[in-house]
Each structure stands twice: as structure tokens, then as C-alpha cells.
Amino acid sequence: MFNIIKNDKNSNARIGVLELPHGKVTTPCFMPVGTLGVMKALKHDVLEKLGCNLMLANTYHLYLRPGIDVIKEYGSLHNFTTWNKNFLTDSGGFQVFSLSNFRKIETEGVDFKSHIDGSRHYFTPESVFKMQEIFESDIIMALDICSSYGIDYSEASLYANITTSWARRTLRAYENRKEGYDGFLFLITQGNFFKDLRKRSTEAILELNSPGIAIGGISVGEPRDKYLEILEYNSSLIPKDKPKYVMGIGTPHYILDAIYYGIDIFDCVNPTRIARHGSLLTDNGILRIKRAGFNVDTSPIEQDCSCTLCTRYSRGYLRHLIKSGETLGVMLASEHNIHYMFRLIQKARNAIMNDDFTQFRKLYLSKYDEGNFNE
């Protein structure tokens, strides 16, 4: 399922290939988030043109709307959405546990209230796996508890223990999956920001020998130095032959940090979310196109970018579209930001191939951190 092609000699960065049911995926890999099986403001053919082979969709949101029975009628999430590349489906755990005032965690599962209409629902590890089996997801995520930064040790320990128990139950369901279904299960480590809990959780998850491992519960509001500390530590506990996934990181500096410590897959809504508000990713930082200084700027967002926006339209025109609320502006900005992330990942792969990733990261971060446009 996972083959390592090249290890960087001066860091833990590596290039690999995931062999998934709907095609090969080269890692490191940034997954765009298509919560409901589609990217906001980006058609499938645009994503394919950009080189996307793996998209994230969310079980919680698909369960609530359009509903599991609807997708079941189509035979799979791929058939329903017409996306013929790979899907990783998140378990929905993060969304459920974000509803802190509307859910109740039990050892059996979690009771929660829909954010749409207030109706009550109950998720178990088995039911969440079954939904993803109906989707025929290429990568399935187990239900887990994503705890917030700053909780006390006893609560973090309890949530890590429940996550491990749910992982065992998910694995049993996966081992009894329907005939012909060939998706891969990723189990999730937890433990908050306590190293002994991280170690205990990871060792227990590794005993289950799932095809892939995810590091959960980081990038949840903690300081960057704490993020780096736990990222490095938890990644070091996972054998190198396992594909490693950190959920919910999508800013360039966090992604380069993750690659440096041996992470293969990451996702985030950030690139398209900020695009909808007129923020564009560049090698020099965030370009905020709504600012008045771009009103008559005839240059592209980035000179060396080959996306539709940069090859055809000016900064001034994009500012006009975004300020006017035109859908085209959001579409162009979203395409640019996803294209930018894919280009950044390709540059990282090239640096790994040349055993130069450490220097690449250092130079990129020195420029990016200083480069927020202030016009």
C-alpha cells in the first residue's frame, strides 16, 4: 500500500507512493478539503487539471446532508459526486467533538445534536465505519476524540483511552468489511500534549497494525513550539514503513514542518477559506487583495505561477471581483491557492530528491514569515 521512494539524508522528510483503489498518490501530499464531496468554488475537472489525486470528504456532514441512504442508492461516494480519484473520509469526530455544548461522550459512542436542525444522533465506531464502507472510501478514518489544547491530564488520558478502545472496535469492523471493498483503514493516536500519553496511545495503536497511522489532536490552538515538540515526538514513535497523516494542518510553514519530521499526508480548509475572503498565498506571504494599494495593480498575483488567475488576470481585476462579491473572484482565488499548495509540495519533493529539504525549508520560512503584504 505504501512504498518509500526517497529519504532525505538530512531530515526525516521522504517521498513515497500510496497505492489506493482509485490510483496512485505521491507523498508528501496535501489533500484539499471537499467536505460534502466537492470543493467550494472548484469543479472536479479543475482539481484534476491541478493534479489532485486525493480529496478529503467528511462523514459527519455527508451523514446529515444528503444522508447515507442517498449515497447508498448511487453505490458509492465516487458515483454520487462523479469524482473518479481517491477519497479519504474523515470520521466526523472532530466536528462532533467541536459541538461541546451539544454532545455527550460515552464509552460506547457519542450522542450529539445536529447543527442543522437540532435533531439528536448517535455515532459509534462501528456505525461510522459502516458509513465509510457505504461511501467506498479509499482511506477510512476511525472515530476518535480530538481533545482541545489546555485540558488537564486526567481528561486527556480518558480521551486517549477511549480513542484506543474505539480503534480496536473499528479494526474489528474493518476486518469484517463487505466482500470486494478494498479501502484502507487509518487509526489515530491521541494523548493531547502529554508525551507519556502520546507514547501509550501510539504503542497501543501500532499493536493493531492498521495500514496507516494518523496523529490527531495537534494544531488545535497550541503555540507553534508546542506543536513542533509533539509533532516531532509522536512521529518518531511511528515506524518509517507506515504512511503518516496529520489532520487539519494547511498553512505552508506548518506543512513544511510536518514534512521535515516525516509526515506524508495533511489536509486543511485554510487555502480555500482564506481565498473566499480575498487572501492569496505567495512565496512572500499572504497577499490581501482587498487592500486599496492593489486597485490599479496590473501585475499577476505571482509572476511564476501558471494558474488561470496568474496567467490571465491582474491583481487589480481580482480585487474588483472580490470586492464586488463576484463568484468568479472566489473561483479564481481558490484555484490559485490550491495550485500554490500543490506547487509548494512539488518543490518540497524536488528538494528531498536532492537531499536539500532542510535548506529549502529554512530559506522558504525566512522569506515567508517576513512577507505579509501590508498595502
Swiss-Prot record:
Q: Does Cytoplasm show up as a keyword for this record?
A: no
Q: In which pathway does it act?
A: tRNA modification; tRNA-queuosine biosynthesis
> Which coenzymes or cofactors are required?
Zn(2+)
Q: How is the cofactor bound?
A: Binds 1 zinc ion per subunit.
Can you name a GO cellular component term?
A: cytosol
Domain of life of the organism encoding this protein:
Bacteria
Keywords, sorted A to Z: Glycosyltransferase, Metal-binding, Queuosine biosynthesis, Transferase, tRNA processing, Zinc
Binding positions for Zn(2+)? 305, 307, 310, 336
Q: What class of enzyme is it?
A: transferase
Residues at the catalytic site: 90 (proton acceptor), 267 (nucleophile)
Locate the residues binding substrate: 90-94, 144, 190, 217
Q: Which Gene Ontology molecular function entries are recorded, alphabetically?
A: metal ion binding; tRNA-guanosine(34) queuine transglycosylase activity
Its family remark reads: Belongs to the queuine tRNA-ribosyltransferase family.
Q: What does this protein do?
A: Catalyzes the base-exchange of a guanine (G) residue with the queuine precursor 7-aminomethyl-7-deazaguanine (PreQ1) at position 34 (anticodon wobble position) in tRNAs with GU(N) anticodons (tRNA-Asp, -Asn, -His and -Tyr). Catalysis occurs through a double-displacement mechanism. The nucleophile active site attacks the C1' of nucleotide 34 to detach the guanine base from the RNA, forming a covalent enzyme-RNA intermediate. The proton acceptor active site deprotonates the incoming PreQ1, allowing a nucleophilic attack on the C1' of the ribose to form the product.
Quaternary structure? Answer: Homodimer. Within each dimer, one monomer is responsible for RNA recognition and catalysis, while the other monomer binds to the replacement base PreQ1.
Name of this protein: Queuine tRNA-ribosyltransferase
Source organism: Borrelia hermsii (strain HS1 / DAH)
Task: Point out the gene that encodes the protein.
Answer: tgt
